[in-house]
């Protein structure tokens, strides 16, 4: 889930990806 790519393997947007990273931080 690296925001540098802008997409997770699940195809989520960068913004959603950042929210996920914060949730698991």
From Swiss-Prot:
Cite a single GO MF annotation: toxin activity
* Gene Ontology biological process terms, A to Z: defense response to fungus; killing of cells of another organism
* The entry's keywords: Antimicrobial, Disulfide bond, Fungicide, Plant defense, Toxin
The keyword Flavoprotein appears for this protein: no
Q: How is it modified after translation?
A: SBTX is known to be glycosylated but it is not known which one of its two subunits is modified; contains 5% carbohydrates.
Induction field: In seeds, induced by jasmonate.
Assembly with partners or alone? Heterodimer of a 27 kDa subunit and a 17 kDa subunit; disulfide-linked.
Q: What does this protein do?
A: Involved in plant defense. Inhibits spore germination in C.sojina, A.niger (at concentrations >50 ug/ml) and P.herguei but not in F.oxysporum and F.solani. Does not inhibit vegetative mycelial growth. Inhibits growth of C.albicans and K.marxiannus but not P.membranifaciens or C.parapsilosis. Probably acts by affecting the cell membrane. Does not have urease, chitinase, beta-1,3-glucanase or hemagglutination activities. Does not inhibit trypsin. Injection into mice produces toxic effects such as dyspnea, tonic-clonic convulsion and death.
Q: What is this protein called?
A: Soybean toxin 27 kDa chain
């Amino acid at each position: 889930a690296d925001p540098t790519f802008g997409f997770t393997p699940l195809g989520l947007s960068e913004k959603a990806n950042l929210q996920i990273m914060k949730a698991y931080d």
